Amino acid sequence: MDIFKELILKHPDENVLISPVSILSTLSILNHGAAGSTAEQLSKYIENVNENTPDDKKDDNNDMDVDIPYCATLATANKIYCSDSIEFHASFLQKIKDGFQTVNFNNANQTKELINEWVKTMTNGKINSLLTSPLSINTRMTVVSAVHFKAMWKYPFSKHLTYTDKFYISKNIVTSVDMMVSTENDLQYVHINELFGGFSIIDIPYEGNSSMVIILPDDIEGIYNIEKNITDEKFKKWCGMLSTKSIDLYMPKFKVEMTEPYNLVPILENLGLTNIFGYYADFSKMCNETITVEKFLHTTFIDVNEEYTEASAVTGVFMTNFSMVYRTKVYINHPFMYMIKDNTGRILFIGKYCYPQ
């Protein structure tokens, strides 16, 4: 949640989407090779994240793969591209298993295309590239984590009911969206009044064991108050208040595609991970060379339609030297927050939708 909150501060009027699973996986890979204060900071951050993660989903930092057996439609993959001149310690190579490939970073364009092709393959063609420009010839290692999620709705929206409706970007700005309709479904729902405003939470299930949770403020511009006040603890508390209600749901079709990846370096530094960058970086359990994290890139994609949701994310580290008597109607027609989670509560993707593309 913390990285997401930092990002929405930097992009207040934009659609934001990240995959905590992908980011944590990449940080865990780095922790395999970290020592000293670098290892202390990474371990502390991962431990703090794990405090808000179900016990059977915690990253124990002993496996490079993020295994989520309850969500068969989620595929994760990790890859390390390193200079063919670096000799890695056997203990590090043993921990990262097979996700390892040597490349010649002097051939920057070829290496860029190699990495982008892997990203495209691992995300089922939904993210065509992580790198938009060639890597520096000084790059010594690149750590890439890809996540691809696709799930059919348990209660599909009827295509013939989809219609054009208004979406309020703000009180003064209105646009049009394709509004999907699903009626008379028993869904988990709650309306909550907090000091900062009222909002609704609705849990929309997929086939299998995952769901999308929507947090919809009562006020058209109420998303900003939710952004400021939401925490992992509050989100868990709110979800614990959900109960089954018969719902008529009106929800926009939406797609979010990023034109440029997020560079998470300043955000990670703000969150206390200062010693994975620059002079104080210590990755001596990885190799004997003095290497540091130069870039930490994260890019995402999501497509929500009548039949399914498909989402992907890629994180790259570049190292250089949501039976009643009545039905509740929920109209999602202004900015909202959403999460895709598995049935243990682990958040796979978290986003804010405020501007139809």
Curated annotation (Swiss-Prot):
Keywords: Host cytoplasm, Protease inhibitor, Serine protease inhibitor
Matches recorded under CDD domains: serpinN_SPI-1_SPI-2
Chief location of this protein within or outside the cell: host cell
The keyword Cytoplasm is assigned to this record: no
Pfam family, one: Serpin
Domain of life: Viruses
One of the record's GO cellular component terms: extracellular space
Site features described as Reactive bond, chain residue numbers: F322, S323
GO molecular function: serine-type endopeptidase inhibitor activity
Cellular compartments annotated: Host cytoplasm
Family of this protein: Belongs to the serpin family. Poxviruses subfamily.
Known role: This viral protein may be involved in the regulation of the complement cascade. Involved in red pock formation.
PANTHER family tied to this protein: GH10112P-RELATED (PTHR11461:SF211), SERINE PROTEASE INHIBITOR, SERPIN (PTHR11461)
Name of the featured protein: Serine proteinase inhibitor 1
UniProt gene name: SPI-1
